[in-house]
Regions:
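N-terminal secretory signal peptides that target proteins for export/translocation
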Residues: 1-2
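Sec-dependent N-terminal signal peptides
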Residues: 5-18
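Boundary at the C-terminal end of the N-terminal hydrophobic targeting segment
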Residues: 20-22
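Short beta-strand elements that form the blades of beta-propeller/WD-repeat-like
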Residues: 24-30, 35-36, 53-65, 91-98, ...
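Surface-exposed loop/turn elements that mediate protein-protein interactions on large endomembrane-trafficking
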Residues: 29-47, 67-81, 102-116, 135-152, ...
Length: 364
């Protein structure tokens, strides 16, 4: 058999395991400009032709192929979606796309029509928030059900803050509500006041503009965490972090408040399961209920997702904190990096990729 024919036979056979394996995806382009995904220790082909673009989460990737077709790959199979021009968004678990005014979505292999009068939409891990211009309503898709949040009488707009599994929105009387796990909880009525809602997963926090008290919505309950003004606050997965007026950094989760830093930090950040901050030129992280010194310098670039921190190290390479353990991945300078699940993808300048997964380094 000619080598060329043998190569393409191997590539096509490579699709067979995709139908039975699905433990998260890590999509990237290889040195042949093929679209591949790292799974189960191997880089497996998804498309053997160049693609136009892609958007990916931990479990699915949607992409436009060279013919302009929208497709989904969920770690098991490729799914043809449409040949028409689309606007699409992807989260770790869901995908929504709009063709003209028709808004449709994909959830665990099932396609659903959300509305034929759609406009703006936002896709998160567990829900999709979208506008329906036919009824002038703001709607939500959650747990395989569609529900109207509010009908707007003074002009429809995407007047909502959306977290991974909750939504804060306002009705016609300027009363704010939280939608969480299929239930609606009233926050309060505020007219001209500006509110800064920070949303994560299962939690939301805000500062009351009247009393300056700091409140947390925690799995269906409102908790007044501080009765005095605070500087800054953010929400993660089941917890919030905030900085008080004295520069102290606090972590709140499940009714417990923990001091992270007693020094005025010039930078801190939160996403999903991890919090990072600078303290006296040291870079710290809070992961798995543990305070960890990550570096003796401030990284020029970093990324947070799930329980992973990946950052540019002092020599320009890539290092990562994964589930509380620090790893040096590569010394190649200025490489791009991304996070999928608990895996770190590093795209090298020579058009090859490195994946750090389960304590090992894989390359294509």
């Amino acid at each position: 058999m000619p080598l060329k024919s043998l190569f393409f036979l191997i590539v096509l056979v490579g699709f067979a395991p995709l139908a039975i394996r699905a433990q998260g995806i890590v999509p990237t382009m290889d040195f042949n400009n093929y679209f591949v995904s790292f799974q189960d220790g191997f880089f497996r082909p998804v498309e053997i032709q160049p693609i136009v673009n892609y958007k990916a989460g931990d479990e699915i990737v949607a992409y436009i192929d060279t013919r302009g077709n929208l497709k989904i790959y969920d770690g098991k199979q490729r799914i043809d979606v449409t040949t028409l021009n689309v606007d699409y968004q992807v989260s770790d678990h869901l995908m929504a796309y709009r063709i003209a005014n028709g808004l449709r979505m994909w959830d665990a292999g099932k396609f659903t029509v959300l509305t034929n009068f759609g406009r703006d939409f936002i896709v998160k891990d567990s829900l999709i928030v979208y506008e329906d211009t036919r009824y002038q309503s703001l709607n939500v898709y959650w747990n395989q059900k569609m529900e109207s949040l509010v009908t707007i009488t003074n002009g429809l707009s995407m007047n909502a803050r959306v977290g991974e599994n909750l939504v804060v929105y306002r009705d016609n009387s300027n009363t704010y509500f939280v939608y969480w796990m299929g239930q609606k909880f009233e926050v309060g009525t505020y007219n001209e006041e500006v509110l800064d809602f920070q949303l994560g997963t299962d939690v939301m926090c805000f500062k009351d503009p009247y009393t300056q008290s700091f409140f947390v919505f925690d799995k269906g309950n409102f908790v007044e965490l501080e009765s005095f003004p605070i500087k800054k606050y953010k929400a993660g997965r089941g917890f919030v972090v905030y900085e008080d007026m004295n520069g102290n950094l606090w972590h709140y989760q499940n009714g417990q408040k923990t001091a992270l830093s007693n020094f005025s930090t010039d930078h801190w950040d939160v996403k999903d399961d991890i919090c990072v901050w600078m303290e006296n030129s040291y870079f710290f992280a809070y992961s798995n209920n543990e305070r960890i010194q990550v570096a003796t310098y401030q990284p020029q670039q970093y990324m947070l997702k799930n329980n992973v921190l990946v950052f540019r190290n002092i020599i320009g390479g890539t290092s990562a904190l994964v589930d509380g353990v620090l790893h040096d991945i590569t010394n190649f300078q200025n490489a791009e990096f991304d996070i999928y699940g608990n895996k770190v993808l590093v795209k090298l300048p020579n058009l090859t990729s490195i994946v750090f997964a389960n304590g090992r380094i894989y390359s294509n």
